[in-house]
Amino acid sequence: MQDYAFRRLREEPLLLALLTYWEGKRGDREVPDRRDIDPTEMPPSLLPHLCLIEICEGNRLKVRLVGTEIVRQHRRDNTGKFADEYLKGEYLAYLTALYLDLRARRLPVLAESRFRHIDTQLETTRLLVPLTMGGADVRLVLMGQVFRYRSGQANAPIAQPLDAGLLEVLNQIPLDRVKRAATPPPPPSSEADAPS
């Protein structure tokens, strides 16, 4: 599954740019902090596809920021709202489990799902990366999201909110390969290894 996930990321340059940026910001740490993130350092084409979610008390998800492409595709701006204020049922349960799993693992997650509506079908790929908020606990998730319509359909938002359709979860893959030790490599063990 890891090979598949990284192949999908190579096929989605915006999501790969987010992962590369996140890895650069974390350095030797397991997870970067929110204060390390500066949108002006990101590719401008990525910004409309970003969403910042806070995991609050009681495991409620609060939308802190939503990019314009996500607003356009979802047909609403949920900035400042809790997910349970505008989502219900299966979709809310899916998203909550996705974010809580990321928090527990402290790893990026690639998630793919499909929404089926009467007149259209849409697939979406999300890359979720964890962030701390001034402490050790993962409290924020920075998500990049891209949308793909079935062949022959316009890349325009559907006539109703995404969650009004039937949800099909395709993949949810923690990216274990990006986890690395926080300790630097040992120095050369002998004089033969040292540069002359």
Model-derived segments and their meaning:
Residues 2-165, 196:
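Sensory/regulatory domains in signal-transduction proteins
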